[in-house]
Amino acid sequence: SGALLVNSRRFSVIETVKDSEGQVFVKIDNADASTDFGEGTTVNQILDWNTRYKYMRTHTALHLLSVCLPFPVTGGQITFEKGRVDFDMPESPDKDQITDRLNTMVEADYTVSYDLISQEELRERPQLIKTMSVKPPQNVDFVRLVRIGNSNKIVDLQPCGGTHVKSTSEIGKLFVSKIEKKGRINRRVSVVLQD
């Protein structure tokens, strides 16, 4: 989210995607034939902090959701309005109970920190990987681990390259907005921030 500044022209970023080979593509508005993005062109990024921060809060909330629902993760998505995770679980959970558990973890003000783990150690600890469809990068020596918790209690520990808040209290109040059945054993759980 944000904009690119190129040769004194401002282009709003519409979408950023990464392909299967790790190349990043940025879709912008107002580009035309006169737009010069040749090699060596200086490009400045202008970050939309409010949007980025909302994504960070939602992303971290989805980590907590994966703690509340300790089932394999089959998919997920974050938009400006909500975040969702698809779980491999046969029965739907109770929305109110999950909402209460999420808000309890938010209010606990757990620290979010990072460690690095070698590929070899990750292979020895496969239980750290919660996602069934998205695997941690295989072409790097070390993978970043996200740790949510404090010295007394680790709430979540898993490989993740996303953006997160520094503490769960930054997430703020949230609620489970919808639980959908997506196939015989898939449940899609959507979470919305209250502000």
Predicted regions and their residues:
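Active-/binding-site microenvironments in catalytic and ligand-binding cores
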Residues: 1-195
